[in-house]
């Protein structure tokens, strides 16, 4: 899958990101259990989707590999606000994006700056940096 890399399940920590069922998620809980005398430890990983806020989980041996999304944090300038959508321009590449305004984001105004993330082809505004 493009935009991801593989890591061992045993090296994951709370607060990191992981792909669960093809959805990039932030890890909120990890529990490791050793089943007995024979057999490897298993990890139960619980995550919340970055973009949909859906709770997902999986169980896997700690020695197995799992996909981790490559998260790219960028800055953009607000060009226009159109109802529940906002048009922003990336300050490095100058590409224009139309993104939904997430809940809890206040203070958006044309000319202001925002921070947004990009992961596996999806975008989300994370915070307002400043105004004009």
UniProtKB/Swiss-Prot annotation:
Q: Which Gene3D superfamilies match?
A: 2.30.30.30, Nucleic acid-binding proteins
Q: Which PROSITE patterns match?
A: IF5A_HYPUSINE
Q: Keyword annotations for this protein?
A: Cytoplasm, Hypusine, Initiation factor, Protein biosynthesis
Which is an annotated GO molecular function term of this record?
translation elongation factor activity
InterPro entries of this UniProt entry? Answer: IF5A-like, IF5A-like_N, NA-bd_OB-fold, Rib_uL2_dom2, Trans_elong_IF5A_hypusine_site, Transl_elong_IF5A_arc, Transl_elong_IF5A_C, Translation_prot_SH3-like_sf
The question of whether Cytoplasm is a record keyword is answered with yes
Write out the annotated subcellular location.
Cytoplasm
Q: Which GO terms describe its biological process?
A: positive regulation of translational elongation; positive regulation of translational termination; translational elongation
SMART domains registered for this protein in UniProt: eIF-5a
Q: Give the sites modified to Hypusine.
A: 37
- Can you cite an annotated GO cellular component? cytoplasm
What NCBIfam families does this protein's entry cite?
eIF_5A, PRK03999.1
Purpose: Functions by promoting the formation of the first peptide bond.
Q: Which family does it belong to?
A: Belongs to the eIF-5A family.
Name of the protein in its database record: Translation initiation factor 5A
